[in-house]
Amino acid sequence: MADVDLLGKYRSAAEEAFRLETQQRYAVPAEDEQFRAFAEGRPMPSDPRVDRSMQIIREAVARGCRIRRVHIMDLPLNLYLRYELAAYQENTDAGEEVGIALRRWHPDLAELAEDFVLFDPEGPHPGVVWMRYDDRGQLAGLVHSDKPADVALAASYRQAALAHAVPLGEFVTLAEAG
């Protein structure tokens, strides 16, 4: 798998970057302290890596690029997914549109099991970065493609995910109401 500068692709996106998350747990060593704090009910410490990502989102949104994400979750929500819901607030504060879709409620989401970021699908230079994870949820590699068939497949997955996603704030309110 070739090296892919994912943050660089966000920086150069002109119209849209769409992230689909399908994993129920991501093993990201850099998140360990934040996750531990969340699990213990303490405030999550700042993380320079997250701060850098949020700055990239703010800059993209400021130049008119739409940044969106949908996480397809399974019920019951595990502790990691509850952590993600809390951590996403930082993303929305930076201007990213975050949606949540429940796989059990929408059978057509069952086939969506591969993470990716789709860049500028309607633009002159569309591309998709497929994100490969191992069984533990660790990122195993990134694969970039600008092949029309790959972009079209990712765009169809994006449409399915967006059709069933609920905005983060609405989902959290519904989840808290029980």
Give, region by region, the residue ranges found by the protein language model:
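PLD-like (HKD) phosphodiesterase/transphosphatidyltransferase domain
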Residues: 1-73
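Acidic, low-complexity intrinsically disordered regions
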Residues: 15, 87, 96-101, 146, ...
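A structural signal for short, well-ordered beta-strand segments and their strand-loop junctions
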Residues: 18-22, 68-71, 99-102, 118, ...
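Short catalytic/ligand-binding loop motif for oxyanion handling, primarily in non-cytosolic enzymes
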Residues: 27-29, 77-80, 138
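Hydrophobic helix-cap positions at the C-terminus of alpha-helices
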Residues: 59-60, 91, 161
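HKD-type phospholipase D/PLD-like phosphodiesterase module
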Residues: 74-111
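HKD (HxKxxxxD) catalytic microenvironment of the phospholipase D
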Residues: 106-144
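Signature of lipid phosphatidyltransferase scaffolds
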Residues: 133-178
